[in-house]
């Protein structure tokens, strides 16, 4: 399948890696623009950009999503589906609808619980015993689209957000 991938942090790399390993045609990878890091303020690539480049994938880093330029690019890339995992920005409705099969999201909670930002942190802070990932169609409202599938996993009482993030990234890629 011809897929446009959108993601930025480490959490998203597992999903992109799985799509590549499964033999999907990745027509492009959208990730956040490079950001200054440390004292020298040298620009740092996102983890998704690093992985995508290592696989020879074409990377795009739009600074604006609502001026028509990104939509025009997506239409040129002609994906059948967009897969989003922690991209870091709310996507306009026209971008969500551009692919023939729409856009799906890998969300790091069992929706509808913890819609929005930082769901892993909330699960740990609230002492939840169980969390998981949800794969859903994207809609205009944040994390409110129809659910395609979900997978749950226990949270170890001593588990921190970073360890849980890594586990959920892999679970999301498998789901």
What are these regions (language model features)?
Residues 1-40:
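N-terminal Rossmann-like dinucleotide-binding module
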